[in-house]
Each structure stands twice: as C-alpha cells, then as structure tokens.
From Swiss-Prot:
One of its GO terms (biological process) is cell wall modification. Coiled coil: none annotated. Belongs to the Casparian strip membrane proteins (CASP) family. This is Casparian strip membrane protein 1. It is found in: Cell membrane.
Length: 231
C-alpha cells in the first residue's frame, strides 16, 4: 500500500541578512550603560578638581598677600634708613669747630673738609639719602603690584651699591675718628678730641649713623632677595 507524503520545502537565500529580499533578522539591541553610571565618574572628577582649583587660588592669594607684606616692610625700612643717612650728612657738614687760644688772632680750627674721609662720608650719606627718597615711589608701586619682579630686582641692585658706598665711607671715617680720639704715638700724631669736643662728637655720631644706615640697607637686600625667591 502506497502513501503520499507531503514534502516541506525550506527556501535558502544566498543574500546577506539585511539586504533586499532577505528575511528580516531580529537583532538584540547593544547594551548601553545606565545614565546614572555614566554620569557618576564625571561628577566624581568635578568634585575632585574643584577643591584643587580652590586650594590653588587660595595659595596664590596667600602668596600675593605675603609679597605685599614684604613690599610694605621694604617701604617702611626705606623711610627708617633715610633718617640716619640724612642725620649723618648734616652732622658731618656742620662739625666745624673753632678754638680760640689767648686772643682772637690765634685760633685753631677743625673743619671736616680738611679730612678727605669726612668729606667722603658726607657725600656718601647725602647720595644715600637722596636715593632713598627717589626709591620710595618704586617701592610703593611694588606694594600695589607684588608681581613686579623687575622693580624688585632694580631696587636690589641699587641697594647693594649703596651698601658698598656707605660701608667704605663709614669705615674710612671711623679710622680718622679713632685717630682723633687716641692719636698715634709712633707717628707723633696728637689726639685732638681733648680740645675739639664738638667736632669729635659730631663726627663720631655721623659714623654711628652711617653704620646704622648700612644695617638697614642690609635688611632691605635680604627682604628683596627673599621676595624674588618666592616668585
């Protein structure tokens, strides 16, 4: 007995899926990261950079504040150094003294310009006092603009020159003052301060004031070097 079977024909296509005539193929969508998970690293990065930026800004503000304080101290020291320099120049220039012996026709006179060291001392202190007055506007600019490193460097160089000038003048005058007070027996130089008290007092005070100005200039140089190093 024969039976008839129905054959099932399965069509086979040679075309790739997705082309025209090919059966549609369902594809699963690609997995995507959740919005919350994607936004979490960005938020964390923003939180981590915000304190850094705030700390950096605070550091620069503190640095400018410290530089401004140093510049203001520099301004005050220049005013303080002006007094001793001017006093030394005036004391030396007005140290002349006349000593009368027996009559007015026999007089001994001590003048500062008879000693080159005292003349040098007066000129050096006058130059230093004038320089300090001229440097005050530049120092004020540095107070208002702490980042002006060029002005600090210029003042540092000029202050160093003033230190050398005043030190040389004060040292030379100190040697003459010591000789005027004590004399020199080997050279047969007699001490004159026993007779010319006013002359010796004024010149001695001028020497002390000059060394005080040198000390204040040294402080100015140290402050300027420290401020430039911070920059």
């Amino acid at each position: 007995m024969s039976t008839s079977e129905t054959a099932t024909v399965i069509p086979v296509y040679d075309v790739a899926p997705g082309q025209q005539g090919a059966p549609a193929v369902d594809r699963a969508p690609a997995p995507s990261a959740p919005p919350a998970a994607a936004a979490a690293p960005a938020a964390a990065a923003a939180k981590s950079t915000a304190p850094r930026r705030f700390a950096a800004g605070r550091f620069f503000r503190q640095s400018d504040r410290g530089s401004r304080c140093l510049a203001f101290l520099d301004f005050l020291l220049r005013i303080a150094a002006f007094g001793p320099a001017l006093a030394a120049a005036i004391a030396t220039g007005t140290s002349d003294e006349t000593l009368s012996v027996f009559t007015e026709f026999f007089q001994f006179r001590a003048r500062f310009d008879d000693f080159p060291a005292f003349l040098f001392l007066m000129v050096a202190n006058a130059i230093a006092a004038g320089y300090l007055v001229l440097s005050l506007p530049f120092s004020a600019v540095v107070v208002l603009r702490p980042q002006a490193t060029g002005l600090r460097l210029l003042l540092l160089v000029c202050d160093t020159i003033m230190i050398g000038l005043l030190t040389a003048a004060a040292a030379a005058a100190a040697a003459i003052v010591e000789l005027a007070h004590n004399g020199n027996e080997r050279a047969n130089w007699v001490a004159i301060c026993m007779q010319f008290h006013g002359f010796c007092q004024r010149t001695s005070g001028a020497v002390v004031a000059s060394f005080l100005s040198v000390f204040l200039f040294l402080l100015l140089v140290v402050l300027a070097a420290f401020a430039i190093r911070k920059r």
